[in-house]
UniProtKB/Swiss-Prot annotation:
Belongs to the YbaB/EbfC family. NCBIfam families: DNA_YbaB_EbfC. This is Nucleoid-associated protein RAF_ORF1224. GO terms for cellular component: bacterial nucleoid; cytosol. The lineage of its organism: Bacteria, Pseudomonadati, Pseudomonadota, Alphaproteobacteria, Rickettsiales. One of its GO terms (molecular function) is DNA binding. The keyword DNA-binding applies. Pfam families: YbaB_DNA_bd. Keywords: Cytoplasm, DNA-binding.
Length: 107
């Protein structure tokens, strides 16, 4: 028979680890790049864009469409890095239990 007090302690420990992982993710920054670094997007762990850097060579009217595409690619790159880190952080808090694909941290 499982010791109920031990079970509660484990649940509280897991909850604390999850809260710590969420705080760590919220404070993390992820840099996405596109076009060999011509466009960089820095996003927070909450998915908010903090900064966009654009190489001056792309600031021409004829480069508008390519610039729009590169910004999108750079943002998606940063978001993918955030998602991977989120999976790893939460999995660590859950003692190695893998999460289902597409599961997001609750924030």
């Amino acid at each position: 028979m499982v010791n109920f007090n031990q079970f509660l302690k484990q649940a509280q420990s897991m909850q604390k680890k999850m809260q710590e992982a969420q705080e760590q993710m919220a404070n993390a920054r992820y840099t996405g790049k596109a076009g060999g670094g011509l466009v960089e997007v820095i996003a927070t762990g909450k998915g908010e864009v903090e900064k966009i850097s654009i190489d001056e060579s792309l600031l021409k009217a004829e480069e508008k469409e390519m610039l729009e595409d590169l910004i999108k690619v750079a943002f998606n790159d940063a978001q993918q890095k955030c998602d991977e880190d989120s999976q790893n952080s939460l999995s660590g808090a859950l003692n190695g239990m893998r999460l289902p694909p597409g599961f997001k941290m609750p924030f």
